[in-house]
């Protein structure tokens, strides 16, 4: 015989202690290390860890990401794969630099660092990245995220930097690296270029009120081109006086740097007479401009012509003195080769008449499109604002660019140039690290020509499985569609130095390795720190010219996007032959799976994709999960200033890391925003973790009492129907969880698991409870073996989701000193599947569920027996199943009789009314017709459609309304003395009339529940027999006397007496009871 006992478990577990014990076992047994060294028959499953920056503390959103990162590697390991879980740290970039600048008091200073300052600055950066490393390690371990932190890749290490250099040289060899002049976003306080990714995040943009001004630029008649002269020839002398171009802008601070005015050559333009003077505008803007002067007559059109007729027309700039002050020209309206140098009209297809005046103010130093136009016309740039955002000209000189608007507007008003001034609410980007408004600024920098491979990046994107799927052609696809060249240079200190050495004549040498640089420099540099300022000291001579490194460092997104290669220190020589890291790289490229927050579509996901496409013509990853952001329960972003930040570790201590992980998987689809509250974590714990634990503790308690011989259990085919049903459901669950996880659908997998555990607890154990009580000295080995197997398999299925709980269950249930995470993933045993059996049981459970809902809705206590219930099934097959399970239905619904209805019945009457919050605005004046249509509709048919979640149509007065389930409210009414409901084709209708006998039985059942609670309060074991004394009166006494045998059997009372007694006394409805253990 194979009898065994299980370690006793508490009914109320301390999950914090349980998880601590499991963590210790993992350490003692080196469980994670075993997954890295044991044979992997299914081969390598490649996972990339997106590198966090360790100089900030981990937060709740890191728990979300790490839960999803951990889930699928655990699953794949159990399927027989090897998963290398190499950790990584992103150690360069602005987050690190800004934290050090704050310590040094550098933030906002507008001059560079000396060599000594730079050396100290980078030393502090190197150490600061590890300030919170212990917090990260503690979080990683505490939540059960398995990661190799003993040998992580670190982006500041020489091997990583050198590998990144190697990639850049390869891209240069492909003709994809170039130096160019472009308008880039800057954070003024740090005067450094920002990437598109850093501005692509939702939080980078804020709704702000900015100026909206229309400014007059008087045209210069003396130099008017012939074509423009002809276009304006119909104007009288008086009408020509003060004629101006009218430009519109929301950035008055750029007006001192104005160099051009742009019009669309194909649009119609007019001279319009207005209260503020005669102006040239697009004809499509006339009505909009007329509305600006509310009390004035509409603008009068005096002449009409095409935009192309205005080319080369000169105008008076809004700030005439600036061009000469900045040294761009020596005098106003300077001409070269017969053409104006500045301040004339140019042609631009991007100008429209949809907003503004149809005449665009151009300040090419601060606008990408403006810069392209200036290049086309050979116009020099004017920098009225420097790269720290400080105005350099006008009486507003020295002010921050956004602060200068008010004074500039007042000055132009005083000089009669202001046509109209107001405000406009729109989105504007801010730097999330400094809080500064972004300054778009033309500057020379280094770029990767990603625009040349834009089509290939789109093609490679088609090969990637995105979760959620709409990201592929939505957020990520749109980002690829809008691809611009990648600005990779940063005017900063702490970062991967660009490996670009230039000669005095501009010749470029891109270095691909330390060995190459050593050879050129004529000395061994293998021990050199490759960061500034040391790398800046390295020069070499070629063909008689000295080469020095350019001062910029690399965009950190290129750093992190290089991790598939640089984590192994991959190096190729100039012939493309492997020098280092090729074997590991080939084994771990591309990734099978990556996961980060949705903002990484414009960050890490993009940099991985771009680099991989350019170098290898394939995606860097096959499957990717994009996670929505976590906000507080009000939908607000979590921040220290709002006081709504939730620290992860106290949350783990209170609810257990498993409960928090389960919440992360189940709260919403992965790409959706998650509104977090502790209440929802508590609910996740209650609904799944506690439910599973309760079944587990129930099994252990009774198995230790009965000590069943599990090996002696009958074959599955010979077990009772309830056991065969549970094992069939178990196989369905194995199938469904496996399929979901294979599809990277954690939530569906969790739902399948949660549904099974609910069935296990609230149906199988509930219906089989008496089989575990060992009445008459018999032990139901079939029941024990069935429940034991179900729990054992569930412990394996839940292992990737809730790794601590799973291991605790498995170790005790299996009797093995081995982790569940080292066991093979369950496979479906097809012979146990039984669609008919599970469908039949589902029909019974549906009726019971519907019946319980009716009881709850009508305040009919579950323990109060009712005379009968009428039941209608959704199909003939379901009806047969219900009839076979009549006894179960009676017991579950606590009724004396069941009547089965066949065919339709009018027992429940329905009426319909519009759901006004949903359809009110949509139908407006048609609401009376809609109400009539609902009154005349087949209410039962509509109710059926609504219950099924299907749309439907109703008609009245020749109007058809196509409605959704949420468009109507369905009111149900049953006859007097009947409580009923319908759903999905099922009907349950209770007879609510109560006889004295039924009332007494209900009271007896309530008394049983009260005595059971008293047993628990007294600390009795479930098997303890008791003597029971009942001090009752009235109806309670009558009920106890009538149902004495039933009460005694339920509460294990071998002696029942009336009156006072000795022992544990408890108050109950109708009196008191006293319990004494025998």
Swiss-Prot record:
Annotated motif 'HIGH' region, positions: 52-62
Cofactor: Zn(2+)
Keywords: Aminoacyl-tRNA synthetase, ATP-binding, Cytoplasm, Ligase, Metal-binding, Nucleotide-binding, Protein biosynthesis, Zinc
Any one of the GO CC terms: cytoplasm
Single GO MF descriptor: ATP binding
Subcellular location(s) per record: Cytoplasm
Taxonomic superkingdom: Bacteria
EC identifiers of the protein: 6.1.1.5
Gene Ontology annotations of biological process type: isoleucyl-tRNA aminoacylation
Catalytic activity: tRNA(Ile) + L-isoleucine + ATP = L-isoleucyl-tRNA(Ile) + AMP + diphosphate
Cross-referenced InterPro entries: aa-tRNA-synth_Ia, Anticodon_Ile_ABEc, Ile-tRNA-ligase, Ile-tRNA-ligase_type2, M/V/L/I-tRNA-synth_anticd-bd, Rossmann-like_a/b/a_fold, tRNAsynth_Ia_anticodon-bd, Val/Leu/Ile-tRNA-synth_edit
Pfam families in alphabetical order: Anticodon_1 (PF08264), DUF5915 (PF19302), tRNA-synt_1 (PF00133)
Residues binding ATP, per UniProt: 640
Motif ('KMSKS' region): 637-641
Subunit structure: Monomer.
UniProt remark on domains: IleRS has two distinct active sites: one for aminoacylation and one for editing. The misactivated valine is translocated from the active site to the editing site, which sterically excludes the correctly activated isoleucine. The single editing site contains two valyl binding pockets, one specific for each substrate (Val-AMP or Val-tRNA(Ile)).
Entry similarity comment: Belongs to the class-I aminoacyl-tRNA synthetase family. IleS type 2 subfamily.
Its biological purpose: Catalyzes the attachment of isoleucine to tRNA(Ile). As IleRS can inadvertently accommodate and process structurally similar amino acids such as valine, to avoid such errors it has two additional distinct tRNA(Ile)-dependent editing activities. One activity is designated as 'pretransfer' editing and involves the hydrolysis of activated Val-AMP. The other activity is designated 'posttransfer' editing and involves deacylation of mischarged Val-tRNA(Ile).
Protein name, as recorded: Isoleucine--tRNA ligase
Organism of derivation: Deinococcus radiodurans (strain ATCC 13939 / DSM 20539 / JCM 16871 / CCUG 27074 / LMG 4051 / NBRC 15346 / NCIMB 9279 / VKM B-1422 / R1)
